[in-house]
């Protein structure tokens, strides 16, 4: 069905949107849809009406698919346009319900806003492509788009004048330092320049700086200098752990003049408590005698002899890292460090008291053992005394009346315990 076209139909935009005429809502007996009331020259189910744009004189050009003639709507706005400080392009879709709902006009279906967007800097080509795509749809809708000249937006939203990423991320070596002392300083190290953007990536690849950071203890050193070790002083707990695992935690090595082999063997100032006490190990099983004069000690292992010789030489190779006290034996240093750390790994089995040394716990345990022995001896003596007094026969003259039984005790005394029946 061809639509009737009118050359120009004056429509007031303010009255069309804000004010609704009195005859806008038909009565109960009205049989025509509201679209005919608004657009009397347009048939029901008409073709798609497309508003391609707004001209400079405020005319809206309407194209009809079946009729090649153009239908222009002229409107005059009652509200003055505010001066625009920033060009804005609006694009939206307004669909008018063309189906007759029956009794009256559907107030909710007057204007169905399907989509609306406020786009900044949209060229006219995008608006025309949007309107052409809307024209191919089957439902009668009305597409409107307003655009502004693109030249007004170019000076506001113009991209930066960068041609490639290499110009954005420039090599800092191209700009040498202009300070007056730059000539006296050594040349800066040569950093590998990043790869260009022509390798296939938009941004340059991150250069590899692994060669600039050597391992620890060699950082910030020139190539002509030799690396030096970085020793770390062990903590007291690590020293105890080294002794437990059999490691060496000796202090700095003494010079060759102060080595144990060159130290004189002095006699022991404090003699043994029991010098004539025989050893439990036979002599043939102790092949390492003490070389000191006047010392008849023999040992079954060489490390025991080495430890014994330190008594004669006074060599103390084990030093405490906290108080710098020296010890001749590693176990003595281990127990000494526990006085600083407060560690007490040895607990008493009887009272639970803790000690830092095993010999202290052993000495404390002997106290409990002696107390236990005295208690056991007292208990045994009491039992012997009770057994001795209970089995001793008493004569009638030695019997004393019972204070608890009183007069009844005479009856029990008259009974002969040896009598039967």
From Swiss-Prot:
SMART domains referenced in this protein's UniProt entry, alphabetically: ZnF_C2H2
One term of GO molecular function: RNA polymerase II cis-regulatory region sequence-specific DNA binding
Zinc finger (C2H2-type): 288-312, 318-340, 346-368
GO cellular component: nucleus
Biased composition (Low complexity): 127-145
Compositional bias segments (type: Polar residues): 236-247
Cited InterPro entries: EGR_N, Znf_C2H2_sf, Znf_C2H2_type
Protein's cellular compartments: Nucleus
PANTHER family xref list: E3 SUMO-PROTEIN LIGASE EGR2, KRUEPPEL-LIKE TRANSCRIPTION FACTOR
Record-given protein name: Early growth response protein 2
Organism: Xenopus laevis (African clawed frog)
């Amino acid at each position: 069905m061809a639509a009737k076209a009118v050359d120009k139909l004056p429509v007031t935009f303010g009255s069309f949107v804000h004010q609704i005429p009195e005859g806008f809502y038909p009565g109960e007996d009205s049989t025509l849809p509201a679209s005919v009331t608004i657009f009397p020259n347009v048939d029901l189910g008409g073709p798609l009406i497309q508003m391609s744009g707004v001209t400079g004189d405020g005319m809206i050009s309407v194209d009809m698919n079946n009729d090649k003639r153009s239908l222009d709507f002229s409107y005059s706005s009652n509200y003055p346009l505010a001066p625009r400080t920033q060009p804005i392009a609006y694009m939206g879709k307004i669909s008018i319900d063309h189906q007759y709902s029956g009794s009256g006009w559907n107030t909710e279906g007057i204007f169905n806003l399907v989509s609306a967007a406020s786009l900044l800097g949209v060229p006219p080509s995008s608006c025309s492509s949007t309107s052409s795509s809307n024209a191919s749809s089957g439902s009668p809708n009305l597409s409107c788009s307003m655009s502004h000249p693109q030249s007004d937006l170019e000076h506001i939203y113009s991209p930066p004048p960068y041609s490639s990423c290499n110009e954005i991320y420039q090599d800092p070596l191209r700009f040498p330092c202009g300070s007056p002392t730059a000539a006296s300083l050594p040349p800066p190290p040569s950093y590998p320049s990043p790869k260009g953007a022509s390798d296939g990536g938009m941004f340059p690849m991150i250069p590899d700086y692994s060669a600039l950071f050597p391992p620890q203890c060699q950082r910030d050193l020139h190539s002509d200098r030799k690396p030096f070790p970085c020793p770390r002083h062990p903590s007291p707990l690590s020293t105890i752990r080294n002794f437990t695992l059999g490691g060496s935690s000796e202090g700095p090595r003494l010079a060759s003049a102060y080595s144990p082999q060159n130290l004189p063997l002095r006699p022991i100032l404090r003699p043994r408590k029991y010098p004539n006490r025989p050893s439990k190990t036979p002599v043939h099983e102790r092949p390492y005698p003490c070389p000191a004069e006047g010392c008849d000690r023999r040992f079954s292992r060489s490390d025991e002899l080495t430890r014994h010789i330190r008594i004669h030489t006074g060599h103390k190779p084990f030093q405490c890292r906290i108080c710098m006290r020296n010890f001749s034996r590693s176990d003595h240093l281990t127990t000494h460090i526990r006085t600083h750390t407060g560690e007490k790994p040895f607990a008493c089995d009887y009272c639970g008291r803790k000690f830092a040394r095993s010999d202290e716990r052993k000495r404390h345990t002997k106290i409990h053992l002696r107390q236990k022995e005295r208690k056991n001896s007292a208990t045994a003596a009491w039992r012997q005394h009770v057994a001795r007094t209970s089995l001793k026969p008493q004569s009638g003259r030695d019997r004393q009346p019972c204070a608890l039984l009183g007069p009844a005790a005479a009856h029990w005394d008259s009974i002969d315990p040896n009598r039967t029946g």
